[in-house]
Amino acid sequence: MTAVQSELISAIRSIPDYPKPGVMFRDITTLLGNPRAFRRAIDELVHPYAGTKVDKVAGIEARGFILGGAIAHQLSAGFIPIRKKGKLPHDTVRIAYSLEYGVDEMEMHRDAVAPGDKVILVDDLIATGGTAEGAAKLLKQMGADIVAACFIIDLPELGGRKKLEALGVNVRTLIEFEGH
């Protein structure tokens, strides 16, 4: 484990049995509230793409907005909010995606991405990968070229990374936690 990984892990609060028994919730609000750790996380996520053409950063609601906005700023790229259905005011494109216990829908503005735009997809954590997979499919459906999907946390036992890689998406994560 690197010093950066140790720093990030120590900045994340772990809450047992939330939102239900048997789940260990990884709360990044403590990382976001720590200026040094927040900057370190953003710098580590951005570093591999400095000097790479990135047109847009797409953030998945809600923590992906915080991280994605900061990453877009660092890369001088635009930002695309990917939201739950019914939350965007203009003409949207929507996709259904699988959750652990059902199906939901997410959307983005139809004019948010142009065919061929180089896009980085961002969220705080990848677990089962259903939400990230849906967002990646939505972006690809609109013609985006996904440069990478970036997350602070990976829960590798839940297989989300593999879902994105099966779509041809390069996945970057900073730290891993065991379990759920």
From Swiss-Prot:
Keywords recorded for this protein, A-Z: Cytoplasm, Glycosyltransferase, Purine salvage, Transferase
Gene, per the UniProt record: apt
Molecular-function GO term, any one: adenine phosphoribosyltransferase activity
EC numbers, comma separated: 2.4.2.7
Record-linked SUPFAM superfamilies: PRTase-like (SSF53271)
Pathway: Purine metabolism; AMP biosynthesis via salvage pathway; AMP from adenine: step 1/1
PROSITE patterns: PUR_PYR_PR_TRANSFER (PS00103)
Function per UniProt: Catalyzes a salvage reaction resulting in the formation of AMP, that is energically less costly than de novo synthesis.
Residues making up the signal peptide according to the UniProt record: none
GO biological process, one term: AMP salvage
GO CC annotation terms, alphabetical: cytoplasm
Species per Swiss-Prot/TrEMBL record: Rhizobium meliloti (strain 1021) (Ensifer meliloti)
Protein name: Adenine phosphoribosyltransferase
Main subcellular location: cytoplasm
Subcellular location: Cytoplasm
The UniProt record lists the keyword Cytoplasm: yes
Pfam family, one: Pribosyltran
Catalysis: reaction(s): AMP + diphosphate = 5-phospho-alpha-D-ribose 1-diphosphate + adenine
